[in-house]
Amino acid sequence: MIYTLTFNPSLDYLIQVDDFEEGKLNRTCREKVFAGGKGINVSIMLNNLHHESVALGFIADFTGRQISSLLQQRGISCRFIEVKEGMSRINVKMRSGVETEINGIGPNITSSDVDKLFGELSKLDDGDMLVISGSVPKTLPDDMYEQIMCLVKDKNIKVVVDATQDLLVNVLHLHPFLIKPNNFELSEIFGVDITTKEDVIYYAKKLQEKGAVNVLVSMGASGAVLVDETGCVHTSPSPSGVLVNSVGAGDSMVAGFMSGYLESSGDYSHAFLKGIASGSASAFSVDFATNDQIENILHSMQE
C-alpha cells in the first residue's frame, strides 16, 4: 500500500474576481473548493492513475471534515488524526490579472496528536511506500521528518521525501528511496548557481553520496534528470504543451514516478518517463491530469 503524509492539509478556495478593487465590495465570477496539500495531491494523482493510497495527516473542525469528505468522494482512503484545538486551514487563491494567495494557519497539533500519528505509521508493513512532503507546521518539532523515518527504518518501506532545504538534507543519512528537488531547490541546498543539465547531474550525485537512493530533479520547461540507485543517469526534455496550471505538477511527477515504478516492477527508465508525463499532463490541464492524458503524453515521449 502507498501512504501519503500531509502535516497541514488545507481547504483551498480558488476564486476569480474580474477587476478587483482593494477596499471595495468585489464579487466572484468563478469559484471552486478543493482539498490541498502536497501529500494529498500525490494521493489524488495516484487515484487518477488507478493506484490505491491512504492519506495521513492532521485535520481539525469542519474544514478538516470537509477535506476528508472531498477525498473520500474521489475514492481515497483517509486515516487523518483529528485535532481538537483550532481548524484546518483555508487557503484563498484569488485570480484577478495576477494571482494573490492568503494561507491560513492550521490547528494546534499536540504531542498527543503526534503519538496518534506515530501509531498509524507503526501499522505500515514491509513493502509499503510512504510519501512525506511539504512544510512542517510551527506546532510540530523541526525534526518530524527524521523522527518518522527513524520510526519505519527497520521495515522494508520505501520512503519518498519531497521537501526543501534542511527538511530534506537532514534525512539523507536515513537513505530515502526517492527525493525530488527542483533545480532551484538544488541550488539553495548547495549555495551555488545551477544553470546547466551537467550541473544538475553533478549535484544530484552529491545528494546521492549523502545517502539518497534515487534523485529526481525537475527543471520545469527544461525537462528532468534522474540519477538512479545503480548510478545510471536518465535525462529527458519536457514534453511540448501550453502551461495552464503549475500547481501540483511536482506532486503529479512524484505520483507518476511511483506508478511507473510499481507497474514495471522497478524499471527506473519507465518510472522516470511516466513521472515526467504525469507532471507535464497536470501542468497542461486545469485540474490534475487524467490517466488518458498522461498515457497520451507518455506514448508521444516513447515514439
Per-region residue spans from a language model:
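Positively charged, low-complexity intrinsically disordered leader regions
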Residues: M1-G23
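Gly/Ala-rich phosphate-binding loop of Rossmann-like dinucleotide-binding domains
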Residues: N47, K153, L262
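Conserved phosphate-binding/catalytic region of the ribokinase-like
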Residues: K197-E303
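Substrate-binding N-lobe of the ribokinase-like
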Residues: R27-M87
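Conserved phosphate-binding/catalytic loop of the ribokinase/pfkB sugar-kinase fold
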Residues: V83, K93-D126
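Conserved phosphate/ATP/ADP-binding segment of small-molecule kinases
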Residues: E146-T230
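Charged helix-capping and loop-helix junction motifs
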Residues: D115-F118, D142-M149, T195-I201, S236-G241
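Short beta-strands and strand-loop turn motifs
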Residues: E101-N103, D128-G134, D162, K180-E185
